Regions:
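Conserved PLP-binding catalytic core of the aspartate aminotransferase-like
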Residues: 149-150, 163-169
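A short helix-to-beta-strand connector/capping loop
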Residues: 48, 77-80, 164-165
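Structural signal for well-ordered, non-membrane alpha-helices
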Residues: 49, 150-153, 157
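Active-site phosphate-binding strand-loop segment of PLP-dependent enzymes
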Residues: 2-65
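Alpha-helical elements of Rossmann-like donor-binding domains used by nucleotide-donor carbohydrate transfer enzymes
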Residues: 4, 8, 12, 16, ...
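Alpha-helical scaffolding segments of alpha/beta enzyme cores, especially the outer helices
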Residues: 36-43, 107, 155-158
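Conserved core segment of the aminotransferase class I/II
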Residues: 74, 79-150, 159
Length: 169
């Protein structure tokens, strides 16, 4: 399986890397990082002064193999972690161009807000209302979507195993 290479990650951080973009779950393989792996990333990032931007946009599609841990729920993650989330993938709201950038550290949040203002990035009120409605009232929809995707995945895996045994999945 796909594993995080912590030795290489630390070497990169030591070399002066200032920002890490992490997908959780990983896209495209769908791997949900363990709480322990994420905690280790946070600890290394704090040690070397690296900001971790954790893209959690696919978190709603967790197939249940491992419980999703949100990066900001981890000890000391609030110091240098940014969490990105959105209902655009889960609820097909991409046209509303809505997402959330959650930053617990007030100093870092201020820097990001300043850069967003310079770039004329402003909240989208229609998107914000739609995203809120999706997360407050969309559980039944999301459950059905996840089940549909799971069935498609299972069908594809069975087909490949039966008809294309040269491909290992």
């Amino acid at each position: 399986g796909f594993e995080m290479d912590f030795e290489n990650l630390e070497a990169g951080f030591k070399s002066g890397v200032k920002l890490m973009i992490l997908c959780n779950p990983h896209n495209p393989v769908g791997r949900v990082w363990s709480r322990e792996d994420l905690q280790r990333v946070v600890e290394l990032a704090n040690r070397y002064g690296v900001i971790v931007v954790c893209d959690e946009i696919h978190a709603d599609f967790n197939m249940g193999e491992r419980r999703q841990t949100r990066i900001l729920a981890l000890e000391h993650a609030q110091e240098n972690c940014v969490m990105l989330a959105s209902a655009t993938k889960s609820f097909n709201l991409a046209g509303l161009r809505q997402s959330s950038c959650i930053i617990a550290n007030p100093e870092l949040r201020g820097k990001v807000a300043g850069e967003m203002e310079k770039a004329h990035v402003a909240p989208n009120i229609f998107g914000a209302i739609a995203q809120r409605a999706a997360y407050e009232h969309g559980d039944e929809w999301m459950d059905a979507v996840v089940e549909y995707i799971r069935e498609n995945r299972d069908w594809a895996l069975a087909y490949i195993r039966e008809n294309i045994p040269e491909i290992r999945v």
